[in-house]
Amino acid sequence: VIVCKHAPISQIQIKSAIKFWQNLGYRFENVKYKSDPTGACATEKPWGYIVIHLVDKETNLEPTALAQTHFFVDNLTGKINWATIKMRPDVRDTVLEHELGHALGFLHFNRIEHLMNQKWEMGGWDTLGLRASQR
């Protein structure tokens, strides 16, 4: 995971979000905060990384969306090769964890209080089905 230079994420926020997913059984290597030694932040396809950016004017973000994640799945292996997360400046609780969920391959699950609920107002911290051991 690389938090790019202008991403509206604090070091505490990324550490907390990573810990959240680690507690569900996921591993993250080489987490970088506003340091990009590989140049992953400058490419559209950051192979092997999840990169987090501030949303920009080129991003076609719906007016009600709080963030947007794109990920690339290799059709042969079924594995995610890279993901980009674009965040609005006003990051709300659960949004970073939700977007990391997309980067891990989870889609929306519209259950009340669930982390992956499409509507932030209806979501929460429920992690039903998100444990690495349940995949």
Regions inferred by a protein language model and the residue ranges of each:
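C-terminal cap/linker of serine protease catalytic domains
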Residues: Q134-R135
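Post-HEXXH active-site segment of zinc metalloproteases
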Residues: F106-L130
